[in-house]
A protein has these predicted regions:
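Cofactor-centric catalytic regions
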Residues: 129-181
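Proteins synthesized as precursors that undergo proteolytic processing into mature forms
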Residues: 1-148
Length: 181
């Protein structure tokens, strides 16, 4: 059995409102709706009419709690992240790093990452130490390549290995791994 659980306040400290007597913050997920088509939200994502605010409607979100099964249907990996619009990039790259490049959990969550926001079409941002030759190759293909102005995700990962379970917390964030007996 496995659970991939991610939740969000959306931006730092959410709405800034603490529930009296309970001590937790309310989120500001309304920012994930498109208040006006073509106007970016706090993460720079351009909204459209399909994500307009409507009663009873759930907003689009980048939250991507993911459970990967092996060929026998057993849990092979559980992964999730915070990071707004960069969540999908971070989760995808960690999955690729483990599955295709055979990285350990810690190697995968610590690896450099890149992100494409969708607009502008030629802008790629990155976090971490990519080889200068890799960045130059992207520039030669017409991309503008810039360091991202905040960490790309905060991925938490659990991987089934032949020896048991491997877990890691992204050094970009404040999480930690706790193994329970």
């Amino acid at each position: 059995n496995a659970v991939a659980n991610t939740y969000t306040l959306n931006s730092d400290f959410g709405s800034g409102v603490v529930v009296a007597g309970a001590g937790f913050l309310l989120n500001n997920e309304m920012d994930d709706f498109s208040a006006k088509a073509g106007v970016p939200n706090a993460y720079g994502l351009l909204g459209g009419d399909a994500n307009a605010i409507q009663p009873g409607k759930r907003m689009l979100s980048s939250m991507s709690p993911t459970i990967l099964l092996d060929r026998d249907g057993r849990v092979a990996m559980v992964v999730g992240s915070m990071g707004g619009s960069t969540i999908i990039s971070g989760v995808f790259q960690v999955l690729v790093d483990v599955v295709d490049y055979r990285m350990s959990a810690q190697q995968a969550v610590s690896a450099p990452r890149f992100h494409h926001q969708g607009t502008p079409i030629n802008l790629l941002t990155y976090d971490g130490a990519f080889a200068p030759a890799s960045l130059a190759a992207l520039q030669q293909r017409g991309y503008t390549v810039e360091p991202h102005d905040w960490p790309l995700g905060d991925v938490q990962l659990i991987v089934r290995t032949q020896a048991g379970w491997d877990a890691a917390s992204d050094p970009r964030g404040r999480g930690e791994v706790r193994r329970l007996p």
